């Protein structure tokens, strides 16, 4: 077996691992709904603490705590991507109609495909652009039924316009994080645990500054929070990191548009949403 074939095989395996994040994010909406009325920053603080703690235990068991000793730029990209995306997203939803803001924020897979062309040795092919554009069109169709009058209906409202701008910033932050992670592939995936723990601390500070605490009402809500921390807000970030660093970044970007569709199916199957052609919020 040649070196090139081994490298291609490793890339394909990493891409499959990265696709696991998309499957996990498909359960995000269901688990978030199951967690009750907990404020967003409080929920982020709890779930990122679980996800980061899980990664910390794993790194310690493997004797890999040295993975946290990374240059400042690695921490800036990691924490900026995780906390920056969620902080901007929460702020956008407070100002703009949720379905429309979510659709704008969900430009990130398309931006990943486009930005990947800036990486050394990468080429942007027409099929990737077409695939990403079709994926965005499909996601737009899912959200269209929930849009409250369309983006243009709120264009003169300065606060709503700010919400759209924040949602667009979300898309740039997450796509930038994903593409820059490829440039920083020397940083081990275990470092993501540190990013999660810092994100949890920043979310806790934001919660106490801007929100009123609400405790989970029952064991089912606690189970949903733990599920979020272990899955969509935990393992998903680790496998995404490995995938974007070692797999086919463009394919992962295109495939990410499957998340809203899968999320819709899960919500309908669980009885949290009617079986219609629209979706109120994205899986990521």
Predicted segment positions?
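Helix-helix packing/entry segments at the starts of transmembrane helices
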Residues: 16, 46, 101-107, 180-201, ...
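Specific alpha-helical transmembrane segments that line the substrate/conduction pathway
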Residues: 42-53, 89-123, 170, 249-269
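Specific transmembrane alpha-helical segments of multi-pass solute transporters/efflux pumps
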Residues: 24-29, 62-105, 141, 230-247
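Glycine-/small-residue-enriched transmembrane alpha-helix faces in small-molecule transporters
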Residues: 1-45, 87-88, 132, 137, ...
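Membrane-interface helix termini and inter-helical loops of multi-pass transporters
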Residues: 30-38, 94, 143-159, 207-225, ...
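Hydrophobic transmembrane alpha-helices of multi-pass small-molecule transport proteins
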Residues: 50, 55, 77, 115, ...
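Transmembrane alpha-helices of multi-pass small-molecule transport proteins
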Residues: 14, 37-84, 109-115, 169-177, ...
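Cytoplasmic-side transmembrane-helix entry/capping segments in multi-pass membrane proteins
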Residues: 14-18, 70-79, 124-137, 186-197, ...
């Amino acid at each position: 077996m040649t070196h090139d074939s081994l490298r291609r095989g490793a890339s394909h395996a990493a891409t499959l691992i990265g696709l696991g994040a998309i499957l996990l994010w498909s359960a995000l909406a269901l688990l978030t709904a199951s967690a009750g009325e907990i404020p967003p920053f409080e929920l982020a603080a709890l779930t990122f603490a679980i996800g980061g703690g899980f990664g910390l235990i794993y790194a310690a068991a493997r004797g890999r705590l040295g993975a946290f000793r990374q240059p400042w730029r690695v921490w800036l990209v990691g924490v900026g991507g995780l906390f920056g995306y969620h902080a901007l997203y929460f702020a956008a939803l407070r100002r703009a109609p949720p379905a429309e803001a979510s659709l704008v924020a969900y430009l990130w897979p398309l931006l990943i495909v486009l930005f990947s062309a800036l990486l050394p040795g990468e080429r942007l092919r027409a099929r990737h652009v077409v695939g990403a554009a079709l994926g965005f069109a499909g996601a737009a169709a899912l959200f269209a039924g929930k849009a409250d009058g369309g983006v243009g209906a709120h264009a003169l409202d300065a606060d709503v316009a700010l919400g759209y701008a924040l949602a667009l910033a979300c898309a740039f932050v997450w796509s930038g994080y994903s593409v820059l992670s490829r440039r920083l592939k020397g940083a081990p995936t275990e470092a993501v645990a540190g990013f999660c723990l810092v994100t949890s601390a920043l979310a806790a500070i934001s919660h106490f500054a801007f929100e009123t605490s609400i405790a989970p009402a029952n064991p089912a809500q606690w189970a949903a929070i733990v599920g979020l921390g272990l899955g969509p807000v935990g393992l998903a970030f680790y496998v995404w990191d490995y995938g974007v660093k070692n797999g086919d970044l463009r394919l992962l970007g295109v495939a990410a548009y499957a998340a809203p569709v899968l999320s819709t199916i899960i919500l309908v199957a669980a009885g949290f949403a009617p079986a219609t052609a629209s979706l109120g919020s994205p899986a990521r």
